């Protein structure tokens, strides 16, 4: 198809900023795969009679990497009010990637609004095979060169290597304080209550057995959600919600004799069948009431920190929100008290008039979005596509696309990958299989 006269190519790229922006928005905003984006563009072009020039997916991939590289190397404001959010991303292989995102305290969204991807700057993206406390400290010191000053605050999940590295960094930068991510703290409190609780262990056993026994039967629609392999106590909500709904269904079926049909064509299983496979949940009715209240308390705390941040008065606001919850049991009140105490300990680190981010949840969200971008490739370890992480934070407009492609070249991508990644797991696999084929 012809190039549109109102979208002249950027330098020697052969495509204009409008087409490039459309490709990137399909991938970054709409969640279309890199290979699927050209097909989507061709479909849109044909349906609307736009006569768009459609790029190859490999060309679009390079645009994505160059946008990410531009975000990683963009000039940042030199200021002493930076907040850094730090965490590791892990994939197959030995490497872990340390990611540092940042936002100036003066640029935080108003209270009541959570941080968004586009609010943040990419300060560092550092894959490495080893992350000791000393190595984290060195990485943080290197990142100071990007912002001109040590950050006012670093928010992390208190992983041993991260918090240890931050402690070493603080010995040289006394003005920097550390904030413990609220969601991880809440998950630790739940873990301390549940992990060794015999009733919880029995419940988990029942959930696992139910998943195996009903997923290939007429009760498949009641299959419990699969547990998260990591961060289990940060993701209890779906499982508890499932259990409460199933408990209500079992009780309703016992009263009615049979459930109402979902459609006129097919009736749902009988009360006897439901009791056979799911009746065990009734024995956990009281436990579920307690556990669900604990989850409710945690959800309120995490939402409050995400939307309000850490400031003088944050603990009082959280206590007020807990007071507004209906009929909390004694154990839930104790958990709420622990979370208020935690909020008070965090706000002691804030000066009057300051407000800090209190959560790395937006960074965790970026990790999730990046894994969606990688799709199956995440099973092959980190590759050049790691640079695409920076593109997740970009506001994709024709202006930002033009600027990125003019400042970050393909040669820059290759140079960064060679220095940061070396020989990747994917490259090792390719070489090994090639040599095995030749020998065969």
Residue ranges: model-predicted function:
Residues 3-15, 19-25, 29, 34-36, ...:
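RNase H-like nuclease fold core
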Residues 38-44, 382-387:
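Short alpha-helical "patches" and their helix-cap loops
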Residues 38, 60, 66, 85, ...:
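Enriched - but not universal
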Residues 149, 159-169, 208-440:
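Acidic/histidine-rich catalytic cores and adjacent linkers
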Residues 196-208:
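A catalytic-pocket lid/entrance helix-loop region that shapes and gates access to the active site
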């Amino acid at each position: 198809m012809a190039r549109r006269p109102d979208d002249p190519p950027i330098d020697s790229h052969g495509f204009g900023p409008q087409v490039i922006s459309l490709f990137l928005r399909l991938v970054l905003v709409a969640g279309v795969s890199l290979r699927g984006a050209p097909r989507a563009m061709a479909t849109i072009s044909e349906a609307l009679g736009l006569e768009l020039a459609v790029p190859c997916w490999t060309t679009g991939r390079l645009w994505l990497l160059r946008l990410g590289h531009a975000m990683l190397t963009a000039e940042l404001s030199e200021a002493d009010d930076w907040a850094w959010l730090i965490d590791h991303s892990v994939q197959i292989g030995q490497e872990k990637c340390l990611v540092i995102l940042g936002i100036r305290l003066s640029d935080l969204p108003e209270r009541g609004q959570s941080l968004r991807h586009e609010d943040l700057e990419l300060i560092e993206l550092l894959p490495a095979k080893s992350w000791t406390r000393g190595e984290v400290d060195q990485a943080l010191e290197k990142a100071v060169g990007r912002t001109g000053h040590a950050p006012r605050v670093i928010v992390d999940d208190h992983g041993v290597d991260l918090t240890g590295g931050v402690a070493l960094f603080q010995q040289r930068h006394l003005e920097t304080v550390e904030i413990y991510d609220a969601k991880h703290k809440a998950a630790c409190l739940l873990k301390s209550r549940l992990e060794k609780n015999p009733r919880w262990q029995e419940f988990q056993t029942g959930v696992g057995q139910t998943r195996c026994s009903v997923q290939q039967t007429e009760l498949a629609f009641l299959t419990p959600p699969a547990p998260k392999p990591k961060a289990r106590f940060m993701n209890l909500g779906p499982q508890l919600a499932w259990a409460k709904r199933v408990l209500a269904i079992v009780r309703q079926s016992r009263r009615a004799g049979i459930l109402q049909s979902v459609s006129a064509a097919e009736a749902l299983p009988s009360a006897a069948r439901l009791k056979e496979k799911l009746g065990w949940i009734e024995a956990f009715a009281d436990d579920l009431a307690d556990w669900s209240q604990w989850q409710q308390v945690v959800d309120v705390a995490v939402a409050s920190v995400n939307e309000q941040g850490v400031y003088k008065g944050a603990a009082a606001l959280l206590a007020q929100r807990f007071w507004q919850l209906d009929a909390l049991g004694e154990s839930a009140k104790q958990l709420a008290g622990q979370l208020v105490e935690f909020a008070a300990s965090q706000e002691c680190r804030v000066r009057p008039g300051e407000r800090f981010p209190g959560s790395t949840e937006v960074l965790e969200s970026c990790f999730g979005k990046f894994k969606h971008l990688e799709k199956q490739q995440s099973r092959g370890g980190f590759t050049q596509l790691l640079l695409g992480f920076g593109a997740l934070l970009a506001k994709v407009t024709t202006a930002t696309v033009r600027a990125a492609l003019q400042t970050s070249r393909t040669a820059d991508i290759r140079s960064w990958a060679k220095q940061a990644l070396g020989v990747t797991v994917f490259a090792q696999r390719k070489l090994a299989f090639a040599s095995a084929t030749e020998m065969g």
